[in-house]
Structure formats: C-alpha cells, structure tokens
Design a protein with these regions (language model features):
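Bacterial N-terminal signal peptides that target proteins for export
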Residues: 1-7
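Catalytic-core regions of glycoside hydrolase
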Residues: 24-51, 97-99, 183-333
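Short catalytic/ligand-binding loop motif for oxyanion handling, primarily in non-cytosolic enzymes
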Residues: 71-74, 111-118, 125, 190-196, ...
Length: 439
C-alpha cells in the first residue's frame, strides 16, 4: 500500500510537470523600431560625420573611407612576410566607432587627382617597397576622363600581384570579426571601381589580367571569413572583367556597389544593365548591395531625398528596387532637403526590418514567428535572445517578406522585456531593434 501510494504521488507530480511544460501563453510585447539599424542606412565620410555628429549622429550607422595600402605596409622580409603597422587604420576605426558607427572600407591603388598619399596629385597607394623595385614601372595619364593626373599601378609586376592577395589574407585574418568594420569593398582601376575611364585599358600593365582577377575573386571568397565583401557593378563589363562569363565566379556571394546611383540616365542605362548582368536579380539575397549617390550633377546628392524624387524616381523606390543596404550620401546634408530627420528616414528605407508577429512562452522556452519587412536581408549573424540565452537560429539571410520560427531555451517575461536581438558583429553602443505589437 505504501509503494502504491508513492507511485500515485509520483505520477501525479509528473502529470503536473507535463501539463506545465505544455501550457503556452502569449507574450504581450510592444516594441518599435526608432531609427536606422546597425549595418544599414545612408553613409557619411568621417570628416563630415564628425562635424555633423550632434545633428546627424543618430541618423546614420555607417561611415565610409578609402584605405591606402601604403599607409599600413612598412616593408617586406626576404621570406615574403609583409611588415605592417596598422595604427593608421586603427585610428580610423576607433574614430568612427567613437560615434557609435561602423566603417565601410575600400582599399584602392588609383585615385585621379588624389593627394592623400604624399600630397602630390594622382600618386598611387602602392607600398613603397614595391615602388622601389627595379622591375616595377608605373604609367601615367595627365587627365583621364577629365579627372586630373593619375598614376597607375604596374600589373606586370609579380610582387604587386602577390602582395595584393597577401594583403587581403592578412587584413581579413585581423579584421573579419572586428565589430568596428561592417563591410569591405574591393576592386581595381580608378577608385577601385573597375574602370579606367578616359584612359586606354592595357591588361597586365595598368589593369590586372582577367586571369589574375579570377584568382583574386576566388581568393577573396576563401579568406573573407564571414566579412561581407563587395565589388563595383562595373565588374559586369566584359571589356574589363571575366566575372559574368564565369559560372564559378558568379556563384560566389560577393555583393555589389554602384558609385553613380540615381544619376539621370541610371534607369534603363549602363548602370541598370550592369546590375542586371552581374546581379541576375538574386545576388542581393546573399551579397550586400550599396554604393554612392551620383556626382554626375551637383544636384544629384543634394536632391535625391526629395519627396518628389530625382529624375522621376524617389529614393525609397530605388532602395526597394535594388535592395539597398547602405548608400554613401556625403554631400546630401549641404543641400537643404536632407535634414537630419529626412536623413534618418532615408536610412530607415534601407536594409532589414525585423517584426515579431507572434511570441509565446511556457516558462522554460520561448518561441516566436519573425518576419523581415525591410528591403534586404541581414548579412551578418544575429540572434534573438531571452536574457543571455540565444536562439540557435540566426537572422542572417532572412529575406524580405519571409518568416521564420525561432525557439529559445529560456522563458520570456510576460511583457517580453528580456527579449532582445544580439550580435557579435555590432558595437556595444549599437542595438538591433525589432517591432512587435501586443498580440
């Protein structure tokens, strides 16, 4: 009798526990997205961002800068080891991060009329140890495309080729998981934009051969280690690049940037054809899409945020069409239209936008249905979490208008106050928001 009584109690308690674990109650969350989200939005250069931080600091999440190999490379050992001093780049990252922003970086060799290497116009950013080699010979154009004096890296030089690959290996090893860096843009030619407008293209001299370009793309895919990397949409041009005719390269998950976005002839013209050729309408699903508002006309940057649109198209329309995650618009605040509030609105028209459509808990677990109501996916890992307990399902890659079901091995509070999105890819000052209305 005593044994039977004990068994009865055990079964009764077990029944209560099973009943408890199967009782799911709604979590009455009420959240709003209040501003641009990390790794998205309109972008300023550091000088502009620094000067406008009081008024525009909350309107942006990203800043852009070119990065010069000659500023971080001190030399090369006899065994081929590149000697670096990253302090210049570290100062740049720290400056941007001090405003709660992340960097979009682009390495380049050529910049027509650029003086940021040595104060002289058009000097390449090739490291000095390569320039001092007897087998390295740069070429020069006095005014290609009307952009001013330009020197060109010597792509016949095998050490330049080797160094270029090694630079990205070493850079990605050091910075791929650094939260101060959001995205990396790469390429060749003027501004690394995959063209030499106004100058004659000479493979293996002023531009890398298609064979080396292929090697470079495959190398980037190998070393990026989760860091989203982008190339110019101009890489779709068969004159310069092998990409669109190479199935293996087209299958890589690189993103795209367009540095003359929304110019007068953009739609239906060369730029849109480039997007279609190299993007195929689906590249945005795995690769970040961004760029810079056009400088073709002085009004392009200053008026693209006009509610009436620019050349018949609004910013919101174009951001949606091309699934834009970020866009440089450094001169926009000087035009009168792009107030801090309008800049904030423009930033919020890009990227991802997470919405919790349903959330419930049984006290020990939480499950929710999450949708992306933005124009692009998130390209780096982030997770919903209850307290310190993360979901095993990353939000990375959730496409616009798609939903996913997420479970977390912890119980949410009744109001969901302990539910957040966490990511190792954002700064401590940043927070990925989500919207949720009481269910």
């Amino acid at each position: 009798m005593e044994l039977k009584g004990c068994l009865t109690i055990v079964f009764w308690v077990a029944g209560l526990m099973v009943g408890h674990t199967q009782t799911w109650t709604m979590v009455e969350m009420n959240r709003e997205i209040t501003g641009p989200q990390p790794m998205t939005g309109l972008v300023l250069w550091p000088d502009e961002a620094r000067g406008r931080n009081i008024s525009y600091g909350k309107s942006i999440q990203l800043e852009f800068s070119y990065c010069l190999p000659c500023k971080v490379v001190m030399g090369c050992r006899d065994d081929g080891t590149i000697l670096y001093d990253w302090s210049w780049f570290e100062r740049l990252l720290d400056d941007v991060a001090s405003r709660g922003h992340q960097l979009v970086a682009r390495f380049r060799y050529e910049y027509p009329s650029g003086t940021d290497v040595d104060g002289k116009r058009g000097t390449t950013a090739v490291p000095q140890y390569i320039k001092q080699r007897s087998d390295y010979h740069e070429t020069y154009a006095s005014n290609p495309g009307g952009d001013g004096p330009t020197y060109y890296a010597d792509w016949s030089n095998t050490e330049l080729q080797r160094f270029t690959l090694q630079l990205y290996t070493d850079f990605c090893k050091r910075y791929s998981h650094d939260a101060r860096l959001a995205f990396l843009e790469v390429g060749f030619g003027h501004w690394s934009e995959y063209h030499l407008y106004g100058n004659e293209l000479q493979f293996g001299e002023n531009f890398p051969t298609k064979a080396f370009q292929r090697q470079f793309f495959l190398h980037m895919n190998k070393v990026a280690d989760g860091l989203p990397w982008l190339v110019s949409v101009d890489a779709s041009d068969r004159k310069y690049s092998p990409v669109v005719d190479d199935g293996e390269l087209m299958a890589l998950t690189f993103g795209l940037f367009d540095d003359s976005f929304m110019h007068k002839s953009h739609e239906g013209g060369f730029n849109e054809r480039c997007w279609n050729a190299i993007g195929r309408g689906v590249r945005w699903q795995t690769g970040v899409c961004g760029g810079e508002i056009s400088y073709y006309s002085p009004k392009d940057q200053k008026e693209f945020l006009s509610p009436d649109g620019l050349y018949g198209h609004t910013w919101e329309e174009q951001a949606h069409k091309y699934h834009i995650t970020f866009m440089i618009a450094n001169d926009a605040p000087r035009g009168g239209i792009a107030t801090a509030e309008r800049f904030r609105e423009g930033s919020m028209a890009t990227g991802y936008r997470f919405v919790v459509k349903r959330c419930e808990t049984n006290g020990s677990r939480t499950r929710m249905v999450v949708a992306n109501e933005g124009v692009a996916p998130l390209y780096r890992n982030a997770w919903f979490a209850v307290g310190d307990v993360r979901s095993t399902t990353s939000l990375r890659g959730l496409l616009p208008d798609e939903e996913c079901t997420i479970e977390i091995a912890a119980g949410a509070d009744a109001d969901g106050g302990n539910v957040n999105i966490v990511s190792d890819c954002i700064l401590p000052q940043q927070k990925i928001e989500f919207s949720a209305r009481r269910f």
